[in-house]
């Protein structure tokens, strides 16, 4: 069973657990435009759902991780179950042949998983299958070929053993960052689908640890927390955008990954969230003009853990989690539904990016007053792979002291 290794993330993981059920659904056809565009729209829709659930919490998730897991499931889905997944992933079924979607994911995963000396970015897909279950030949071949998925026979009649096996796979793939993801597997589980993404990058322009000091971060009108604030002065890709009433700062990692930070003007977070579009994000990511700036950015570790059944239900993906699921393309031994869908992503932002950077870069700076960019209040960020325009992670920092 061939598999190139998983997606290296600042650690994002998606786990879908399938259980047995009775019943089925009806018939469907094809999906949308190129993968990155659909992923950007999917990320946007999912972000909106998460902010509606709570506009005071940190948010962090990996759109590419969740979409990859769902696209794999769609290979074995039929009827409305199939249509809902592809529409929910923002594929316009009149604009792209379904085969092109899966080929697109295959190319994307291949590009993301290319070995880089500058950063680590790895994705992985694991199928944990009850020993009593036989996968359909076509599904088994397709997930291996298109999604580089590995299949593992699993004894689900011993849930504790099965949990241990799945968690060990995830822990290894995320280099120990995500542990004990799966707890309390239900007794009717027969299939678990796990996708992880792991990213570790180094800033192209690292911050100097000596300049990091404790400073206030204004969570809201009534709450201030103390955080280690990193500082660096230099030439940055940064500008103010009046459409979203926010400062935009691009910080590059070595290699071709960039973080796009969005700092709303005073009281304008809601305006930013309402006006930001995938098209604007693509436009920002291509900006190259630089300005002399004084950047203050909090050191932080942020994570998000989401129940996908709940979140994706808001995007119209409901059948696959219910008695209406038709996953007969995966196996005909028994009717399946996803009994549990989990996504966990985590990220650390520090002076080095993540790994120590020994070199110090000297740059020529103008004799002018630098623009202050103080990330000392809630902000948004996106981590984007430049070679493919793919949104790897999306985050919102409301309180950097909350893990």
UniProtKB/Swiss-Prot annotation:
Any one GO CC term of the record: extracellular space
SUPFAM superfamilies registered for this protein in UniProt: Serpins
Signal peptide: 1-22
Residues under site feature: Reactive bond: 367-368
Superkingdom of this protein's organism: Eukaryota
UniProt keyword annotation of Secreted present: yes
PROSITE patterns assigned to the protein according to its UniProt record, in alphabetical order: SERPIN (PS00284)
Chain spans, region RCL: 358-377
BP terms from Gene Ontology: acute-phase response
Keywords attached to this entry: Acute phase, Glycoprotein, Protease inhibitor, Secreted, Serine protease inhibitor, Signal
Record's subcellular location: Secreted
Induction section of the entry: APF rose about 2-fold during the acute phase reaction.
Glycosylation sites: 55, 92, 155, 222, 256
Main location as per UniProt: secreted
One Pfam short name: Serpin
Keyword DNA repair among UniProt keywords: no
Gene3D superfamilies: Alpha-1-antitrypsin, domain 1 (2.30.39.10), Antithrombin, subunit I, domain 2 (3.30.497.10), Serpins superfamily (2.10.310.10)
Example of a GO MF term: serine-type endopeptidase inhibitor activity
Domain notes: The reactive center loop (RCL) extends out from the body of the protein and directs binding to the target protease. The protease cleaves the serpin at the reactive site within the RCL, establishing a covalent linkage between the carboxyl group of the serpin reactive site and the serine hydroxyl of the protease. The resulting inactive serpin-protease complex is highly stable.
Family recorded in the similarity comment: Belongs to the serpin family.
Chain's role: Inhibits elastase, chymotrypsin, cathepsin G, plasmin, and trypsin.
Name of the protein described by the UniProt record: Alpha-1-antiproteinase F
Organism taxonomic ancestry: Eukaryota, Metazoa, Chordata, Craniata, Vertebrata
